[in-house]
Amino acid sequence: MEAASHGAYEIGGRTVGFNITLAHEQFPNPYLTECFTFEYFFARKVSLAMAAKVFVFFPGGFGTMDELSEILCLTQEGKMPKMPIFLIGKDYWETFDQVIQKMATLKLINESDEKIFEVTDNLQNVVDAANKIGHPKISENFYDGFRQASEV
């Protein structure tokens, strides 16, 4: 996510990071105007889900799959509002998409669940979705809750 933060930072945008403390890797990137560090994955995932208006997933490892699965499940079950969910990189996400299609074929999920997300290489789709939603003006009180949670 450093590249996205870098671009926004360069044009004077607010860049907020939700970092997790791990035994290896996962350091905040230098382009954040604000960073919240969490000890526990569940607290980070809840915070990410509460703060987001659009979800954009790039190729990643188990953590990425964990976060994506959580968002898909919460969306499918109606536990959070439907929001645009983009998986960037068709070559990478093709197999994942096939697994989801197989789940629908086997009636393990509804056919409509296949449409919860969009696999694309077209970043303009993401920009258009974000622009439709607009840039929410989130009060500082909203982030105060994250500050408190990240200090636990």
Regions inferred by a protein language model and the residue ranges of each:
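Active-site/ligand-binding-proximal alpha/beta "capping" segment
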Residues: 39-88, 134-142
